[in-house]
Amino acid sequence: MMRKLAVTLALASTALATPALARDNAWYVGVEGGAMIVEDINFDIGAATSAGTVDHNYGWDVGGVIGYDLGGFRIEADVSYRRATVDGYRSTVTTPARTAAGALVNFPAGNYDYAGGSSSALSFMVNGLLDFGEDDGIQGFIGGGVGVSRVKADYGLNDNGSFLDDSDTVFAWQVLAGLRQPISDNIDVTLKYRFFNADNVKLVDVTGRNFDGRFRSHSILGGITFNFGEPPAPPPPPPPVE
């Protein structure tokens, strides 16, 4: 009787120790999207420090990932695009801009609450993520990544034409944290926070003046991930020979 009880407990403990949804040594692909806040962009204009500031409305952030789960640590590549429209522009120097008719006019320093246009960033990143928690339950993760980003600015004053329409490709980095939850043997849903930073963005306005600044954003993203290619689970151990 005691031997049978010991065998039963051994088999039960083996089953409990083996995750129902093993993600170790598996590939995954995913898509994600959500809302974004862009920090005010302060531009050095020519020799004038912090001479122009761009305010933004709420924006959006979408992307896709492909990665590999090493067991407790994941490495992945992601491509993402984020964009927000301009809510206002203020400058301590004059702003040359083209009118709707195409004429070039110098607008005085001041606040332009109805400035238009958008800021955007397309990025290609490589990330490393640390996982904590069980594969078959809610699992947390934290990590970061580095890569390159193409930052684009397209700004206009009021109903007039553009005063800045340029882009630059720069080094970028990001910090990531979130949760993931399996909903089937191969599919997870995710909730992620992303802090994204692209420094040393150098742009040129319609008259050739340099605009130097940075792009920073905060995003909350929902996503779905498909896991595939995991090795088959090992067979259960044979029962002890009585």
Language-model region placement:
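Predominantly the C-terminal beta-signal and adjacent terminal strand-loop region
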Residues: 98, 103, 184-241
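Outer-membrane beta-barrel translocator domains and adjoining extracellular loop/strand segments
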Residues: 41-49, 87-94, 152-161, 201-209
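Short glycine/proline- and aromatic-enriched beta-strand/turn motifs that initiate or cap beta-hairpins
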Residues: 20-67, 153, 223-227
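Outer-membrane beta-barrel biogenesis signature
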Residues: 5-30, 229-242
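Gram-negative (and chloroplast) outer-membrane scaffold detector with strong preference
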Residues: 65-157, 221-228
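Outer-envelope beta-barrel architecture signal
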Residues: 23-29, 71-73, 136-140, 169, ...
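Residues that define the transmembrane beta-barrel architecture of outer-membrane proteins
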Residues: 37, 56-62, 118-124, 167-173, ...
